Amino acid sequence: DWAIGKFLEEFQQHPKFEDTVFIITADHAMAHFQSNEPYERFRIPLFIYSPKHVEPGISENYGSQIDLLTTIVDLLQLEGTYSSIGSNLLEEKPNYAVVKEGALINIFSPLGFLQHSLGQIVHYQPGENQPSEQDRQHLEEQVLAFDHLTYLLLTSNRWQRL
């Protein structure tokens, strides 16, 4: 943490500082694999720093690494076509994250956590609300729709921005 702060402090003197976006994250949460708590196993930090472009704050929204490309492209206001199924993490969006874990696909949202084998539900953990069959069913529909859409786009080579 200290080294990152020192680097940013020194880089403020660079002429390109105002037009630079710093993105710091991890590619996995290795230390958390010992936990049985899914929210802890998959939680990784994401730090986006660009005083000219990003308002300071902390987001409690769910997101995953598939959202990084869309976030960066939108933040940099890049022109042209690109392929992504992610959402911009800096905008209001459906509050969920989909994470693959080997052959399993997981979805996190305020409604809860659901792990699916694409044949059946492997694990369901309700969110902050009282557990409901409707919430579980909604999460299952979301994760299956996400997987189906990804499959269709890949097999037909028809990626599009959603």
PLM regions: where:
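Solvent-exposed soluble domains appended to multi-pass membrane proteins
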Residues: 1-162
